[in-house]
């Protein structure tokens, strides 16, 4: 029983430690989600936690929304073979 608890705790820990992080990216333009209030930022946090993103926490870093705890399926900046175009 103790072994099962230890294995479960390790799996949870690995999932938390190895979670993806990065800048949120607009898939159509290839650009980062921008922000102006550096540090704790409600807009970035809300975007990161949105169902389509799946992150656990977001804040403004270097004028872009940085997300932590993202699933591997969520794309982050830069997108492969796509440059930022603000058209």
UniProtKB/Swiss-Prot annotation:
UniProt-listed SMART domains: Knot1
Pfam families: Toxin_3 (PF00537)
Function description: Beta toxins bind voltage-independently at site-4 of sodium channels (Nav) and shift the voltage of activation toward more negative potentials thereby affecting sodium channel activation and promoting spontaneous and repetitive firing.
Disulfide bridges in this chain: 31-84, 35-60, 44-65, 48-67
Record keywords: Disulfide bond, Ion channel impairing toxin, Neurotoxin, Secreted, Signal, Toxin, Voltage-gated sodium channel impairing toxin
Tissue specificity field: Expressed by the venom gland.
Listed name of the protein: Toxin CngtIII
Main location class: secreted
Protein family per UniProt: Belongs to the long (4 C-C) scorpion toxin superfamily. Sodium channel inhibitor family. Beta subfamily.
InterPro entries assigned to the protein according to its UniProt record, in alphabetical order: LCN-type_CS_alpha_beta_dom, Scorpion_toxin-like, Scorpion_toxin-like_sf, Scorpion_toxinL, Scorpion_toxinL/defensin
Source domain of life: Eukaryota
Record's subcellular location: Secreted
A biological process term (GO) from this entry: defense response
Residues in the signal sequence: 1-19
């Amino acid at each position: 029983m103790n072994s099962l608890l230890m294995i479960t705790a390790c799996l949870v820990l690995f999932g938390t430690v190895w979670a993806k992080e990065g800048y949120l990216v607009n898939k159509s333009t290839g650009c980062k989600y921008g922000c102006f209030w550096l540090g704790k930022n409600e807009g970035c946090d809300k975007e990161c936690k949105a169902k389509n993103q799946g992150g656990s926490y977001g804040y403004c870093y270097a004028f872009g929304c940085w997300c932590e705890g993202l699933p591997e399926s969520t794309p982050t900046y830069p997108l492969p073979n796509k440059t930022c175009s603000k058209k």
